[in-house]
């Protein structure tokens, strides 16, 4: 049996093509990136000037001839020059840090916004195959990991390569023999990076995958805590969570191992070179073939070389995590939106006139997959203002059929028409403004009653909200709340009863004044007294509107103009009472 929490991220090589995909998000801030690059060049120039000043201070005033006062004065000027260079470098470093952080966070903000927008527009079939915890990890942790790539990773790494080349030229100009000795370190670091590349890549991918799985499982456990407590399964659930937590911890420890081994070997290679440089350079100074100041200058320039060499190795492995996150983030950004764009590039016909609509199903088929056919040749028409009750056994395709009206899914065969126009040819936003959908498995958002009824749409005034609440008979209850419409709603509406949540969801559908109402067992969770009030209100609410209602209650079926019986995905009966 497959694990529902299994990581579905692709396994593949890290592609620099991700940078090309990232560029559209970075392009608006390219001037700031250019400024950062300019700061790096100026800072590097100052780094080269500092050792040059020290060399001339050592080989000049400190070792030269002449009066002591003049030599001290010259040494002081050299000291001031070195201090000025150091302060200027520190100031530029501060500005560089601010700019890179500013740039990185803005790109991250735009990526996260695009990713969330893509998740909102992805088809239901995509979301049904994912877990909320995985997608949350993509939008939060994975996107944040890109900051290392955007802020300093690529820019700093490219500049470090240029820096290494420039420093090598200077080292060979100062002393060819010592320069040849120092460059022996570079191939060693490159070899180590290549050796650990594959293992580090796999380790980081494993960490991202395990973390996503743990988040998914955590979200499900929190959502199902009542069921866990009711059946006394706290210990069993805690044990399962401990197993997944342990797997995540083991994945992190694997990355720590690769980091530790890599950094230790690189550091060992660089320190060995430093010892050799001290021996050979010191010998040359004692033999008089190399000036002390020149040796100090070479030593400091070697620091400018070894630093970037080590940082390149570190960044290469740190960037593995960023590229692993890129793999997931851009995988989601590539997920097609639903509804898909029209082949001719048009936005879709405008929605037909407002008013009670004619809803027609013409030989409609629907399948969730090659071997998961749900609807087969469904044909019927709901005339304007007519209420049709859809009944049938579990699994007959009732909920699927209703979802096709507002184009939550597309039929795989035949067509669904609104006032004679295929819903696939209508503007999706205008179509859904005309069709209101109320599901049995409703969802209330964290916020206020007002937010949930008008669904965060500020153009819907409170008068319309009160009218919708009155229609479903819950306005007195809302008025009794201490804060009325501003009363807080907990996550998933946990502060209200199931029946109250259902009525609020029904008011949400009515507040947009739809032409077509699609009710999927909308009264299933309401008690008999509340249902009696609702049925009376529905008679007025449905007047002048077309309605498709999935219902099991006899009272709901009796109120319908027609009854449609589904069985095995087919219409087996269609008629009145």
Across the structure, where does each feature detected by a protein language model lie?
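Helix-loop-helix
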Residues: 64-65, 170-184, 254-327, 332-333
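ABC-type nucleotide-binding domain
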Residues: 349-577
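Membrane-integrated ABC transporters
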Residues: 1-47, 62-82, 96-100, 104, ...
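An intracellular "coupling" helix at the cytosolic face of ABC transporter transmembrane type-1 domains
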Residues: 27, 31, 124-125, 141-150, ...
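Transmembrane helix-loop-helix hairpins at lipid-water interfaces of multipass membrane proteins
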Residues: 33-92, 172-177, 272-275, 286-292
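Short intracellular "coupling" helices and adjacent cytoplasmic loop segments at the cytosolic face
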Residues: 2-12, 105, 113-137, 141-145, ...
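Alpha-helical segments in transporter systems
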Residues: 20-23, 31-53, 78, 82, ...
């Amino acid at each position: 049996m497959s694990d529902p929490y299994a990581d579905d991220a692709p396994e593949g090589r890290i592609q620099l093509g991700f940078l090309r995909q990232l560029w559209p998000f970075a392009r608006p801030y390219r001037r700031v990136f250019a400024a950062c690059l300019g700061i790096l060049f100026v800072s590097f120039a100052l780094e080269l000037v500092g050792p040059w000043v020290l060399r001339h201070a050592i080989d000049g005033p400190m070792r030269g001839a002449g009066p002591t006062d003049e030599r001290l004065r010259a040494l002081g000027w050299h000291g001031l020059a070195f201090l000025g260079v150091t302060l200027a470098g520190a100031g530029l470093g501060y500005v560089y840090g601010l700019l890179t952080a500013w740039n990185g966070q803005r790109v991250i903000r735009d990526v996260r916004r695009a990713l969330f927008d893509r998740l909102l527009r992805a088809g239901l079939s995509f979301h049904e195959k994912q877990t909320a915890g995985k997608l949350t990890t993509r939008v939060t942790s994975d996107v944040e990991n890109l900051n290392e790539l955007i802020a300093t990773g690529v820019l700093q790494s490219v500049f470090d390569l240029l820096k290494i080349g420039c420093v090598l030229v200077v080292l060979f100009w100062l002393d060819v023999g010592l320069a040849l000795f120092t460059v022996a370190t570079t191939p060693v670091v490159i070899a180590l990076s290549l050796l650990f590349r594959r293992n580090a890549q796999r380790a980081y991918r494993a960490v991202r995958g395990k973390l996503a799985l743990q988040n998914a499982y955590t979200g499900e456990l929190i959502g199902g805590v009542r069921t866990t407590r009711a059946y006394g399964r706290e210990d069993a659930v805690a044990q399962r969570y401990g197993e997944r937590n342990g797997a995540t911890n083991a994945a992190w420890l694997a990355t720590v191992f690769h980091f530790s081994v890599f950094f230790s070997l690189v550091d060992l290679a660089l320190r060995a070179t430093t010892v050799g440089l001290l021996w050979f350079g010191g010998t040359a100074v004692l033999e008089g073939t190399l000036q002390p100041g020149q040796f100090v200058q070479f030593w400091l320039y070697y620091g400018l070389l070894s630093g970037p060499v080590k940082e390149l190795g570190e960044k290469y492995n740190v960037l593995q995590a960023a590229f692993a996150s890129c793999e997931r983030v851009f995988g989601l950004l590539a997920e097609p939106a639903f509804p898909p764009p029209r082949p001719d590039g048009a936005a879709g016909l405008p929605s037909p006139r407002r008013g009670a609509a004619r809803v027609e199903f013409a030989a409609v088929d629907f399948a969730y997959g090659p071997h998961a056919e749900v609807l087969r040749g469904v044909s019927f028409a709901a005339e304007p203002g007519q209420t049709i009750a859809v009944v049938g056994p579990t699994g007959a395709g009732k909920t699927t059929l209703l979802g096709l009206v507002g184009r939550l899914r597309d039929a795989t065969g035949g067509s669904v028409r609104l006032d004679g126009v295929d819903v696939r040819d209508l503007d999706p936003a205008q179509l859904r403004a005309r069709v209101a959908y109320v599901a049995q498995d409703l969802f209330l958002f964290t916020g206020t009653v007002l937010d949930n009824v008008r669904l965060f749409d500020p153009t819907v005034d409170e008068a319309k909200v009160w009218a919708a609440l009155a229609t479903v008979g819950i306005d007195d209850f809302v008025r009794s709340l201490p804060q009325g419409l501003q009363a807080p709603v907990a996550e998933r509406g946990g502060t209200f009863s199931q029946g109250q949540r259902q009525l609020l969801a029904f008011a949400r559908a009515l507040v947009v004044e739809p032409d077509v109402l699609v009710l999927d067992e909308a009264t299933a969770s309401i008690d008999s007294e509340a249902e009696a009030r609702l049925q009376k209100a529905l008679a007025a609410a449905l007047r002048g509107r077309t309605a498709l209602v999935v219902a099991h209650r006899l009272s709901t079926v009796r109120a319908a103009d027609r009854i449609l019986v589904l069985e095995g995905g087919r219409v087996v009966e269609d008629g009145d009472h």
